[in-house]
Amino acid sequence: MQASDRFNINSQLEHLQAKYVGTGHADLSRFEWAVNIQRDSYASYIGHYPMLSYFAIAENESIGRERYNFMQKMLLPCGLPPEREEE
């Protein structure tokens, strides 16, 4: 791999990280990573009707109620963030 290839790959990665929130970066904490994964999962469940209907049947709820519950869970999917240590 040449230096120009590495530069091109890094610039593409930086572009993706700026464009999409869930792609992460070097300073991403474990909590932020987990939040991105959970939100991505909930968005996928809401966006795919068969999965949404599966959850609705499994939990004996209406599809609208399941959609609402998933959207509410997207607000704080992993609970409150941990307190940061001040340096």
Swiss-Prot record:
Q: Which Pfam families match?
A: SF3b10
Could you tell me the superkingdom of the organism this chain comes from? Eukaryota
Give the InterPro entries listed for this entry.
SF3b5/RDS3-10, Splicing_factor_3B_subunit_5
Instruction: Kindly list the biological process annotations in GO that this record carries.
Output: mRNA splicing, via spliceosome
Write out the similarity annotation.
Belongs to the SF3B5 family.
Q: What is this protein called?
A: Uncharacterized protein At4g14342
Q: What species is given as this protein's source?
A: Arabidopsis thaliana (Mouse-ear cress)
Lineage of source species:
Eukaryota, Viridiplantae, Streptophyta, Embryophyta, Tracheophyta
